[in-house]
Amino acid sequence: MKNSIAKTLTHGEQVRFYFVDNTQLLQEIFELNNKIPLSLKLLLGKTVSVMSILSGTLKGNQRMSLQITLSNPKYKIFAEAEANGNVRGYLNERLLTAPGLEEQSMEDLIGSTAMISVIKGSDMSQFTSITDMPNQNIVDDIANYFVQSDQTPTYLHSTIQFDDQASLLSSHALFAQLLPGAPPQLLSEVKNAIKTNPEIFSKLKAEEASDNEEELRRMFGSAKVIGYSSSQFFCGCTKEMFYGMLYSLSEEEIKRSIEEDEDIEAFCHICGKTYTFQQKEIEHLL
């Protein structure tokens, strides 16, 4: 299922303002990670939610890859967004199996020395940026990346609601960025409007933004819907991608698998899909 991103210009067309209800996207990802504690759901959910809205800022065949290294450098979060709206994200195995997760908050896990690494661009041209996380907050520190790396004042907001059993109820995200020449204070006006109307984006449907321009104008003084894009979970894994894993096995391991008539299984850590390599496929490796 696709989640629609509404793209608007506000404040006299000086601010680009996007918003999305990405509940379905996060639901799909949480179903693949249904046993993780709430702190990890928040880490993964906030990261993917922000990448979902940022997919709407990409063009052509652009891609944005994000790696968050927490204060314990063994713990990492990965996410990727493409211009076509495909989004994926996961936590590394060391973080998933870290001790004491039930007792730690999202802020505790991020810590004071976490780092964000971003690779952005197309196949022909990419650049890498690394920024710190002074806010110990996924959303604010990804916004800080735009300020540090692109010198572009940016505001990001993500709201994720869970029930008493830590099951997802809803998820919304928004993105606001000043266009060249816009007064810096406009971003503060956007933040204040959101704080004053915290429920607005749980009521407005992004795909119906054109019918709600009046409500947006009430919040921002002026608003114009300029388009839509989609955002959806997409892993993109294939069986062929895992052949490299087979070639990394030793000759002894391959022979043992053949002698014991055992298939070899490869597990995708992003979507959870399992690929089985049968005896005929394994024999070709020798």
Give the role of each language-model region.
Residues 195-286:
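Cys/His-clustered metal-coordination modules, chiefly Zn-binding fingers
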